[in-house]
Amino acid sequence: ANWKLVLENNRECYHCNASHPELLKTLLEWDDVTDPRADQAFKDHVAASAAAWDAEKIPYAHASFGLRNRIVRMPLLKGTVSMTLDGKQGCAKLMGRIKNPDLGSMRILHLPHSWNHCMGDHIIVFTVWPISAQETVVTTKWLVHKDAVEGVDYDVERMRKVWDATNDQDRRLAE
C-alpha cells in the first residue's frame, strides 16, 4: 500500500473502534487522559494503575524527546494483562526483573517508523519502511524472556493472533 496511508493509519486511532475488534479486547483506544474521548472511568483506571506502579517503582510518566520520540506506560483494559485474545499472559515467564504481569503497555515510539508495546510477559516491535510510493514493508516481532521455551512457556500462534489480525485489517484499510 501507499506508504503515507500505511503510516497515517498506524498513527491515528480513530479507526480502531470500527476496525480492530481483536485489538480492543485488551488495548485502550487512546493513551492520554487529556484525549477528548477519555471519560472519567478511563481517568480513574489510569490513576489506579499509576498508584500500583508507584508502589512497585515502575516508571510510567509520559516522556517526549523532540517531536518524534515518546515513551509512555498505559494500562490495558481492566482484567487484562497482555495483548492476547483473552487478555491473559501470552508467556509464562515474565520479562526482566518484573514480578507482576499487570503492567499495562509501555509504549516506545520513534515516529514515524517504529512503535513498540512492552508488557510484563512479552514485547511487540513494529517497524514500517516505504520501499516505493505504493509499497511498504511492515515488520512485527514478538520478544519473550530469553529463557522462555516455545511450547512450554508460550504458544506462538496464541501470542500472535491479535496483532496478526490487526496488521491484516490495517493492510486492507490502506490498500
Where are these regions (language model features)?
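C-terminal catalytic domain of Rieske-type non-heme iron oxygenases
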Residues: 1-175
